[in-house]
Amino acid sequence: MKRRTARERAMQALYQMDITGELNPKVAVENTLDEGEETNEFLDSLVGGFVEHKETIDELIRQNLKKWKLERISIVDRSILRLAVYEMKYMEEIPHNVTINEAIEIAKTFGDEESRRFINGVLSNIKDTL
């Protein structure tokens, strides 16, 4: 599985956990996989890492939102932000610009017209604080 695909599956797992309120990364990841597709270490670490650090990640996002509340952001955008912030804060081997670019590409696929600009702005602010 390519890293882009793993990130997309991770975003879908975070989306699912947000909607259901269930923070079970194993089940959420399994529900995103196509038939015959297997998870990989990168995907598992993204979803499991988010669950482990959810409070810290959400607080970091809140501190960098201007005129928005985390709870009012669309679930898709919130999931993309959470995934990217986890990657930026806890996966130091991945350059921040790569993470931001990947988040923007995922937003183009899953978000609305404004998602990519919004996500780029928030993540750029967060990058400056890390």
Swiss-Prot record:
It comes from the Bacteria. It holds the Pfam family NusB. The keyword DNA-binding does not apply. InterPro entries: NusB-like_sf, NusB_fam, NusB_RsmB_TIM44. Coiled coil: none annotated. One of its GO terms (biological process) is transcription antitermination. One of its GO terms (molecular function) is RNA binding. GO terms for cellular component: cytosol. The keyword Transcription regulation applies. Involved in transcription antitermination. Required for transcription of ribosomal RNA (rRNA) genes. Binds specifically to the boxA antiterminator sequence of the ribosomal RNA (rrn) operons. PANTHER family: ANTITERMINATION NUSB DOMAIN-CONTAINING PROTEIN, N UTILIZATION SUBSTANCE PROTEIN B-RELATED. Belongs to the NusB family. This is Transcription antitermination protein NusB. The gene is nusB.
